[in-house]
């Protein structure tokens, strides 16, 4: 309210109605408007269960329930905002679903570990921006969490062409970027991937892949 700004915040640990029976929280991304009103919330759908031998072990599903829906993009003064969280970044399906629903900006508040962040963070953010032709805004936790984990930091903004237009580093910091929707529409006009998508094929391939994985 004091600054008159929108805030994209996450992830918050939220107790849902199922807390008494599951004893698991939801990892929640909240969007507030300049009056402080809660405009939208998204519960993280992809949980980070990974094991990097000798480096990182995480099992988010041991204390977290997965969300069950993708939240429709929210209209803001700078464009239509899509909400995701951290590990969701590894799944292009959610960014493409948000783009299909009208998103112009994708937000990923995150806490990548140092091993995964140094290898994948920028690559994934640029990939999501290029394939969706959206701006990607990714806040990032930084610093030492405990003796076994350090967060990577490097909060970043990527434009629809895939260029990094603003970036922090490992320590606490703040960066700014202009959201130019005219430029976004130009990129989409010049490379019209939405018109070229073969949705008649993707469902068949996904079903075959799911059957093979099972």
What are the functions of these language-model segments?
Residues 1-8, 80, 86-175:
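CN hydrolase (nitrilase-like) catalytic-core segments centered on the catalytic cysteine
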Residues 9-11, 28-31, 72-73, 155-157, ...:
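Short beta-strand scaffold segments in enzyme catalytic cores
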Residues 12, 43, 141:
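Histidine-centered beta-alpha loop that forms part of the nucleotide-sugar donor binding/catalytic region
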Residues 13, 73-74, 129, 168:
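A structural signal for short hydrophobic beta-strand segments in well-ordered beta-sheet cores
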Residues 15-101, 114-124, 190-193:
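Active-site catalytic loop in hydrolytic enzyme cores
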Residues 37-40, 163-165, 185:
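Short helix-loop capping/hinge motifs at secondary-structure junctions, enriched
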Residues 180-182:
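C-terminal accessory region of radical SAM enzymes
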Residues 185-214:
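A short C-terminal boundary segment appended to hydrolase-like catalytic domains
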């Amino acid at each position: 309210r004091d600054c008159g700004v929108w805030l994209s915040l996450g992830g918050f640990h939220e107790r849902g109605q199922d807390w008494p029976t599951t004893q698991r929280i939801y990892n929640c991304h909240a969007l507030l408007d300049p009056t402080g009103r809660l405009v939208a919330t998204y519960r993280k759908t992809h949980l980070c269960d990974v094991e990097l031998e000798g480096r990182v072990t995480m099992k988010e599903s041991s204390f977290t329930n997965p969300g069950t829906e993708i939240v429709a993009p929210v209209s803001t003064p700078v464009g239509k905002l899509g909400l995701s969280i951290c590990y969701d970044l590894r799944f292009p399906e959610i960014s493409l679903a948000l783009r299909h629903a009208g998103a112009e900006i994708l937000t990923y508040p995150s806490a990548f570990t140092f091993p995964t962040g140094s290898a994948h963070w920028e690559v994934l953010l640029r990939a999501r921006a290029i394939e969706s032709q959206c701006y990607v805004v990714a806040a990032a936790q930084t610093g030492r969490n405990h003796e076994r984990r350090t967060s990577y930091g490097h909060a970043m903004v990527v434009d629809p062409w895939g260029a990094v237009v603003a970036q922090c580093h490992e320590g606490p910091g703040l960066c700014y970027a202009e959201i130019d929707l005219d430029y976004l529409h130009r990129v989409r006009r010049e490379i019209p991937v939405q018109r070229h998508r073969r949705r008649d094929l993707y469902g068949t391939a996904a079903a075959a892949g799911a059957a093979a994985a099972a």
